[in-house]
């Protein structure tokens, strides 16, 4: 233990405060302890490991059927009913057959039931991920030589016409598309599992909420644009790469005259019904114990009308086509394709992880329990790794379905088993009944599901008033998603977020503090009235960390606010230059901090102060450049007869100052007691006492 400065209290003696340093522990000892804890083999350790990897084995033993079962069954049935039409619809986004969406929904629910730590999150197909998967699938299909104007829901897609390069493949379009999707999914899952094993769950925190909202907005516009051709029944090429949204709109305008009247009428009716039902459901949700299964009702009615009205034969309306039943045999994803999509999987893994962890934490906070971010990464990763061998594509947590689970009384992840059972029933028996379902109806389901994300644009003005930097991140991410690509939008959002963070730390708020009346508290003299400046002492606050990027701004701020360029004046004194005085009044409070003024005094009497106190409470950390800056500043002030004191330093900052040579070398060295203080008031009182002693000594001499 080393003795820290003793704060002086008015009317009382000094209160001894001692800091207890933690026992030094090297990297070797720390790794040895972690390995010993992790690798020790016993029945209890194995049981704890299994329970950590499969949380269901822990909470199932505490399950209370009388309290939980009714809510879990109800929410599971509702989610299962919603999953079926969404799975069929989202296959349009992924460019795959509907059967693969059903596979994905089935296996993802079962795996997350075993491995997830959230009680309310619904994991399965997600529109944004389906869009990203579809973009990669379309690109690889085009590179393989398939006709990009065809899509996987078109009857006869497996026997579609190939050009020269595609003729070398051993399967058709749909077969190759699912191979690409499974390779992408396996790589995505491997990245997520690796992040979970390496305890990188904190990485998702760097994808801020404005970034995710802007990404959702931009991707939703891209999804909406991709579905317009199905709403209108227009056959246009599927554009890829930068400018896809703009090129698609131009193609739609050129082909608007070829719109299918039957699809337009169907889309108009379905959109009106779905939007009206959603608005009414949102308005009266407090009266509805169970959300209305509007999507399922619309799909059932539309399928019956299409079947008995023979809309495909009479009007050429596009339909879903054959949807097989049962399960296909497992297949190992191709390593060659995994190499091609490895980079695409990085963006997919980050987006899925960020949405899954943020949703899990959101529902955990609102319902009073905790989740483990690293286990969520493992769970979502396994929801991608294992199903990749079973003809599934990438999944993550979905907000809309998770909200429905909560609203319908979900208590545990047992509801996911009920949802998987509903999907299994469709897979085994009911899938062929959707043969005559129009694709325009599926597009309507997708478009209506984007309401929440598209409405986020109305949050932009409020976000701008609250934080312009966050608003720029939101707008930049959304614009890049729409004008370039979703992957580029994610990258742009991350870069803008990092630049925003760097900008805030590079030029933090600075101020000179003054005393609040006769109290021991100090505040910004420009923000509050009636504050009393301390004569002969300048109290400076730097509202951020001190590191290599802002050390020059730190010095400029300090010199400008105090009216004394200590570095310049100390150099002039060393060179034997002439004295210069401080301008009357010094710099105005709050004016722009440009080049440091050279009008300064060489002695404290001319400068108007004898001590500078730096309030280090906002100083989160220092690096080597920051410590060097403080050392140079102390030397320059010392050359002018001015003292430099630090107040409110946190223990980590004290340690950095000690290791950097700013303080004395030995424990208990008086240098620390002379320079570091527990409060600003202690530093000011000590500075005034020292100055009085110095004046008394000079007078005596």
Curated annotation (Swiss-Prot):
Main subcellular location of this protein, as a coarse class: membrane
Q: What does the tissue specificity note say?
A: Expressed most abundantly in the kidney and liver, with lower levels in the pancreas, testis, brain, small intestine, colon, and lung.
Bilayer-spanning residue ranges:
68-90, 94-116, 176-198, 255-277, 290-309, 342-364, 377-399, 412-434, 472-494
Molecular function (GO) terms for this protein are: bicarbonate transmembrane transporter activity; chloride transmembrane transporter activity; oxalate transmembrane transporter activity; solute:inorganic anion antiporter activity; sulfate transmembrane transporter activity; sulfate:bicarbonate antiporter activity
Which segments constitute the STAS domain? 527-687
UniProt-listed PROSITE patterns: SLC26A, STAS
Glycosylation positions in this chain = 158, 163
Per the record, what is the consequence of mutating residue 275 to P?
In HYSULF; uncertain significance; decreased sulfate transport and decreased oxalate transport when expressed in Xenopus laevis oocytes
Localization annotation: Cell membrane; Basolateral cell membrane
> Gene3D superfamilies per the record?
STAS domain
What is its membrane topology? Multi-pass membrane protein
Q: Where is this region: Disordered?
A: 1-20
Q: For this UniProt record, give its keywords in alphabetical order, as a comma-separated list.
A: Anion exchange, Antiport, Cell membrane, Disease variant, Glycoprotein, Ion channel, Ion transport, Membrane, Transmembrane, Transmembrane helix, Transport
The chemistry this enzyme catalyses reads: thiosulfate(in) + sulfate(out) = thiosulfate(out) + sulfate(in); 2 hydrogencarbonate(out) + sulfate(in) = 2 hydrogencarbonate(in) + sulfate(out); oxalate(in) + sulfate(out) = oxalate(out) + sulfate(in); oxalate(in) + 2 hydrogencarbonate(out) = oxalate(out) + 2 hydrogencarbonate(in)
A GO term (biological process) for this protein?
chloride transmembrane transport
Q: Name one GO cellular component term.
A: basolateral plasma membrane
User: According to its UniProt entry, what is the function of this protein?
Assistant: Sodium-independent sulfate anion transporter. Can transport other anions including bicarbonate, thiosulfate and oxalate by mediating sulfate-thiosulfate, sulfate-hydrogencarbonate and sulfate-oxalate anion exchange. Mediates oxalate-hydrogencarbonate anion exchange.
User: Family, per the entry?
Assistant: Belongs to the SLC26A/SulP transporter (TC 2.A.53) family.
State the disease linkage annotated in the record.
Nephrolithiasis, calcium oxalate, 1: A form of nephrolithiasis, a condition in which urinary supersaturation leads to stone formation in the urinary system. Patients manifest acute renal colic with severe pain originating in the flank. Patients with small, non-obstructing stones or those with staghorn calculi may be asymptomatic. The majority of renal calculi contain calcium. CAON1 is characterized by calcium oxalate kidney stones.
Can you name this protein?
Answer: Sulfate anion transporter 1
Species this protein is from: Homo sapiens
- Its gene name is SLC26A1
